[in-house]
C-alpha cells in the first residue's frame, strides 16, 4: 500500500486537478490537497503548483511479480520453455504444436505467450495495440530516495512523468506512452 501524489506541473492545470481532487473526495477516497510549499517541504519537489495526495494506491514490481507467477505455476505443473524462440504455432483439435527456431516441437493443450512485441507476428487476431513507454532507473542509493518514501508521483504534463522508489532503494522515473513503431 502506498500513497500517491498527483501534482500540477503547470499553473493552467490547477483548476482541473482541483476538480479531480473534489471528485475523488466525493467518491470516498482519502485525499488531501497540498499546496506547492507543502509538496516542497515533504518531498523536496520544486516548481509544482499544488496537488492531490491519496492514501490508497499500490505499485507492483513487474519483474518480481512475473517471476513469482512463474514459480507458483511451475509448482502446479506448468512447463516453462524459457529462452525458446517460437517459429510457428499450429492449432489442432485436441492440442497445439509449437515449432521452435531450433526445429524442436512442443505439444500442449494450452500455450501462454510471454513474448511481448513479437506477439503480433505469431497471433493472427488483432487484439493488441502495442505501446512504448520510457523509463530510467537509478543506481541503488537508499539515502537519496528515502525522502520519497512509499509515494507514487504523477504530474499533469503531456507526456506525463511517473516516479517511484523501488524496494531495493532505486528511483524509477518513466512516462510518455506512445504507439509502438518497429
What is each model feature region?
Residues 16, 22-25, 47-110, 114:
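Helical element adjacent to the flavin cofactor pocket in flavoenzyme catalytic cores
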Residues 1-36:
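Dinucleotide-binding Rossmann-like beta1-alpha1 core, especially the glycine-rich loop
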Residues 34-39, 83-87:
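Beta-strand segments within the central parallel beta-sheet cores of soluble alpha/beta enzyme folds
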Residues 10, 58-59, 126:
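Hydrophobic alpha-helical scaffolding
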Residues 38-46:
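Flexible hinge/switch segments at interdomain interfaces of large molecular machines
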Residues 9-11, 102, 140:
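Short, structured patches in soluble enzyme cores that scaffold and shape functional sites
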